[in-house]
Amino acid sequence: LDLSKFCQVPGGTAVRAALAEMRQSKTNVCLVTETNNLVGILTERDVLTKVATTPENLNIAVDEIMTANPITVTPDISAAEALWLMDDKQFRNLPVVDEKGKIIGSMTHQAVISFLAARYPVEVLNRPPRPDQFPRKQEGG
C-alpha cells in the first residue's frame, strides 16, 4: 500500500507555502508537525472551506485552519478497517504513525481502493450476476 503521497510542513508555516508544497508533491494533504510529531492535517477540503472564500487566509499559519490532533492509524491496520474508518468519519486521508507518534505516511482512500482492486482477478470482477447465465454476446468494460 502506497503511503508516500503526502507533504509535511512544520507548524507556523503560512497556508500559501503549505499549498505550494502540496502542489509540488502532487497531493491533496499536508501533515503539520512539531519536532517530527504530527500535530495536525491540512487537506484540500480545509482549503476550499476556509481559504477559497477568504483569500487573506493564505497568509495565516496552517495551525489556524488545519484539523488539530487528527485521528491516526498504525501500519498494521487492515485495508477494510481503514476504509470503514474513512467512511464512518468522512475522511479521505488517514495519517499513519508508529507507536511513538512518528509519521510513516498518509493513507488515502484511493490508495486503499487501488490496493484492494489489484488483489482481485479480472475474471472475478467481470462475472455475471447469475453464474448460470450465458450472455449472447461478449460484454466488457
Each model region followed by its residue ranges:
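A glycine-centered beta-loop-beta connector
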Residues: 22-25, 30-46, 86, 94-110
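The conserved cystathionine-beta-synthase
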Residues: 8-26, 33, 72-90, 97, ...
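Short, flexible active-site loop motifs that bind/organize anionic cofactors or intermediates
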Residues: 5-8, 37-38, 72, 102
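Tandem CBS (Bateman) regulatory domains
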Residues: 1-5, 43-74, 78-88, 106-141
